[in-house]
């Protein structure tokens, strides 16, 4: 057995999301169909539950497994306080594909894709397991001064719309 060359496995980042699933096998299939995920690892236990799996979405790896050992899925908890942000070349196309595959669109301003003041176009989905994803495309690179001005303009407009 060779000693590890790095403390971070090849292809991983120093922070890697690890999602607990109600049905990891179905989630793996859905992430492939809806988000174009590539399955890198899939380790079912003797009972057929997924003990560990890894997928690549874009340039990032996400780990996942079925509920076990006290781990609870977003579905079991009624949602997740954490969300995932996915940058792609065409957020509108991937958004439509994910919705066609069974994602739901949350209510509010981060639902259907729209241009945002910080230079992204993005929209939100909730996957069948209950995890929220923002699907985004960077449209403009802003200077700090441009971003600050746009933020001020946005919040003034938002405050006026609430009266």
Regions found by a protein language model. Name each.
Residues 21-25:
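Short acidic-aromatic low-complexity motifs
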Residues 129:
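C-terminal catalytic core of tyrosine-transesterase DNA break-rejoin enzymes
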Residues 2-18, 28-126, 135-163:
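Vicinal oxygen chelate
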């Amino acid at each position: 057995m060779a000693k590890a060359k790095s403390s971070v496995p090849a292809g991983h980042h120093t922070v890697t999301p690890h999602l607990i699933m109600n049905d990891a096998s179905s989630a793996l299939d859905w992430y492939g169909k809806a988000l174009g995920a590539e399955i890198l690892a899939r380790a079912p236990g003797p009972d057929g539950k997924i003990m560990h799996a890894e997928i690549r979405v874009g340039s990032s790896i996400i780990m996942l497994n079925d509920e076990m050992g006290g781990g609870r899925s977003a579905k079991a908890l009624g949602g997740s306080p954490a969300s995932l942000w996915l940058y792609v070349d065409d957020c509108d196309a991937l958004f439509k594909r994910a919705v066609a595959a069974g994602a739901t669109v949350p209510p509010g301003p981060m639902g259907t894709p729209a241009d945002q003041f910080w230079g992204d176009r993005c929209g939100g989905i909730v996957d069948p397991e209950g995890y929220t994803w923002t699907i985004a495309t960077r449209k403009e690179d802003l200077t700090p001064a441009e971003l600050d001005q746009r933020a001020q303009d946005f919040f003034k407009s938002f405050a006026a719309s609430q009266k």
